[in-house]
Amino acid sequence: GEGWGDNDARFLAFSAAVSALGRTAGHQLVHLNDWHTAAAASWAHGEIPVVLSVHNLAYQGRTGVEWIGRLGPNAGAFVRDGACNPLAGAIALADAVVVVSPTFREEVLRPETGAGLDGLLREKGDALVGILNGIDTDDWNPAADPHLPSPFAVDDLAGKALARAALVDRVGLPGHSGPLAVSVTRLAEQKGIDLLLPLVPELEALDLQVAILGAGDAALADALRDAAERHPASLAYVEAYDESLAHLLFAGGDLLLMPSRFEPCGLGQMQAMRYGTLPVVTDVGGLHDTVTDLDEDPANGTGWRAAAADTPSFRSALVRAVSGWSDPDVRLGAQQRGMTADWSWSGPASRYVAAYRRVIE
């Protein structure tokens, strides 16, 4: 999961190639993604409209200021705090900047959540747009998922019970009548899995089992492994990235845990809802835009949102989730709303087309 030491050289060369290709005859704009292609804006700006998508403001590609001399005619925009900052330069030069949810657009304008670029982003005005990502609804489709023991759909959830049984068997948890919560995650500070660790001794009292799939930070993996060994009836941890198991977790889980400290968009909550698994999330970024709290809006709710990214707040949301899940009417209504919502790329694609039109017309 670590980057190569010469990533600055790799992506600078790639960006130069992207810019050269974009400026050839027939192209109407160049669309860059994150810091990896951001340097292309130093050549493209002023010659062809530039759209920049930012998926995570924390990753800016900062490198030595000596790289400025290798950029194009607008290299000065990339100098920031005595370094070369590809993402900052592209934000300054882009004709439109797209962040990956409407709420994340609001967050990046604030000093506490703007990763040092909030002032630059405020200068973009209406050229800063928030467009929620979609998911591949063919790949994430419980009615035709080859990773499941049996297909299921919103009008027949019998296959979901079979998926839960298969999941429990695969990860080694004992039989349990209460809800099974799952998490498919990177082990990184952003994702907030460490906020769950103090709750592990309480899981039995909360009538909750948890299965976590994820890899990344070694210390966090060690802590999860230790917690699972100490509480084998309550917590199962699989240290891996395993797409087949991820599908089974989303299908077999009752609740999805996403205690993110920040989440520009998030895909897991949408994937889980496709499978009738109700999300318990922090109230940040794209999680705010996609999960409606059942206690705040029972008629439209799809999950539960913790008021803050800390252990007490997430515990409170979990308590509410276990209670809500235990009510069959609440559970089924939320499952139906999540499974029938349109999480596809159809809507986001049309909003991207509108953003393209604004910069080329």
Model-derived regions: residue spans:
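Catalytic cores of nucleotide-sugar-dependent glycosyltransferases that transfer UDP/GDP/TDP-activated
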Residues: 1-361
